[in-house]
Amino acid sequence: SHLFQPSLVLDMAKVLLDNYXFP
């Protein structure tokens, strides 16, 4: 089963930040 891994969270956060393009 897939567990909620910190690495996955960080990767998703990076993508979200890149998409939203926060200053």
Swiss-Prot record:
Which of UniProt's keywords are assigned here? Extracellular matrix, Secreted, Transport, Vitamin A
- The primary site where this protein sits is secreted
Keyword Transport assigned to the entry: answer is yes
Under what name is this protein listed? Retinol-binding protein 3
Q: Where in the cell is it found?
A: Secreted, Extracellular space, Extracellular matrix, Interphotoreceptor matrix
Q: Which positions make up the signal peptide?
A: none
Asked whether the keyword Secreted is assigned, the reply is: yes
Task: Spell out the GO cellular component terms annotated for this protein, sorted alphabetically and separated by semicolons.
Answer: extracellular region; interphotoreceptor matrix
**Lineage: superkingdom:** Eukaryota
Which GO terms fall under molecular function for this chain's record?
retinal binding
Gene for this protein? RBP3
Report the protein's function. IRBP shuttles 11-cis and all trans retinoids between the retinol isomerase in the pigment epithelium and the visual pigments in the photoreceptor cells of the retina.
